[in-house]
């Protein structure tokens, strides 16, 4: 038996299957206001929330790594790490152990990430077991790309890899950082390049924007926390829930419109509802602000570097509030939210991408970038 905890406050008792790591039974919450926002409707939703909290089995080499370590499922690995995350302040407490948030949280306690080491290059066969009583954030890190958490100068930083042999996705994050820095209008995560040796691709690294005071509530949890009227779009529903939690409607709208416009310019096709959200005060549960823009790697035609025709540039599929990129522009009421005169030049982007000579069709990528700007 475990208690689902939010910091040092119990939320509800849960029974977890010792083999699969799945939640089998959920008791009546003792503090229902502390339930995870997206898992507060019923026990089935909480079980689903727990399942989605675990590292995806398709992330990098995670399946092979877990097999090597004798771990059956990602949820079992999550249980071994007490459900801890560097995204929020939820965890599970064994009922027979005296533990507190201060003893185990990853924000103020040092940790190592041996699974992350294996994800980013160390031979999987070199790690035969994980250190006992040492918790790691790798059991709850999300996304398909291989990742590793490190602590540098006391800061929690995430290193992120790429699909395939070139470094375009990591360099896309550098491009997005430059764009947002030059605009200076909305909060964003700063990415830098990192390389372990010349035999490996360029990776990107960023500092965590959560802390022991602030946690991320993903947009998917926000829209799922309240029943949506069928006549209302998910976009408007998200805004309405944020406003109901005390956020200023104008601030939410201006952020979303800026994000839509910059994603359009960068051809970021993967702004799904786990890739943006709200920062919440972990003690008062107040919605403080929109989380800074992060995760723009799936952009700049990275899956199709050969320049599509102009007509094709208006038919790009996306994973977001709408299925087509052009449809998202309908939500934008103020295109001056982005200053086109301050966008990075093609020469600036070329300098970034030329760090990796393996990136194909660079001229076509830059031409596509120019044409997308012209569409605005």
Specify the residue positions occupied by each region the protein language model found:
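Phosphate/dinucleotide-binding and metal-coordinating scaffold of catalytic cores
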Residues: 1-261, 265-267, 278-376
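Canonical protein kinase catalytic loop motif
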Residues: 272-277
């Amino acid at each position: 038996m475990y208690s689902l905890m939010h910091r040092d406050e119990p939320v509800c008792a849960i029974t977890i299957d010792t083999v699969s790591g799945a939640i089998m039974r959920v008791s009546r919450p003792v503090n229902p206001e502390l339930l995870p926002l997206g898992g507060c409707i019923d026990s089935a939703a909480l079980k689903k929330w727990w399942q989605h909290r675990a590292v995806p089995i398709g992330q990098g080499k995670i399946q092979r790594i877990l097999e090597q370590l004798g771990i059956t499922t990602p949820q079992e690995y999550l249980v071994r790490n007490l459900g801890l995350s560097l995204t929020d302040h939820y965890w599970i407490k064994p009922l027979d152990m005296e533990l507190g948030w201060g003893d185990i949280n990853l924000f103020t306690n040092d940790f190592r990430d041996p699974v992350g080491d294996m994800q980013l290059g160390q031979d999987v066969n070199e790690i035969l077991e994980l250190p006992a009583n040492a918790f790691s954030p790798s059991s709850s890190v999300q996304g398909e790309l291989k990742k590793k958490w490190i602590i540098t100068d006391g800061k929690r930083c995430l290193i992120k890899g790429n699909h395939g042999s070139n470094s375009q996705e990591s360099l896309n994050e550098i491009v997005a950082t430059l764009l947002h820095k030059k605009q200076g209008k909305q909060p964003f995560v700063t990415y830098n390049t990192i390389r372990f040796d010349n035999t490996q691709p360029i990776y990107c690294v960023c500092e965590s924007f959560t802390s022991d005071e602030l946690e991320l509530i993903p947009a998917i949890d926000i829209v799922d926390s309240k029943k949506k009227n069928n006549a209302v779009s998910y976009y408007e529903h998200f805004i309405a829930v944020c406003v109901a939690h005390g956020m200023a409607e104008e601030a939410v709208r201006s952020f979303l419109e800026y994000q839509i416009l910059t994603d359009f310019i960068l051809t970021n096709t993967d702004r799904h509802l786990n890739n943006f959200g709200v920062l919440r005060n972990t003690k008062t549960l107040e919605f403080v602000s929109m989380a800074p823009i992060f995760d723009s790697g799936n952009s700049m035609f990275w899956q199709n570097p050969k320049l599509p025709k102009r007509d094709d540039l208006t038919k790009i599929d996306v994973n977001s509030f709408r299925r087509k990129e052009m449809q998202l522009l309908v939500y934008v009421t103020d295109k001056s939210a982005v200053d086109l005169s301050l966008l990075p030049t093609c020469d600036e982007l070329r300098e970034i991408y030329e760090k990796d000579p393996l990136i194909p069709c660079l001229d076509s990528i830059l031409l596509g970038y120019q044409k997308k700007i012209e569409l605005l």
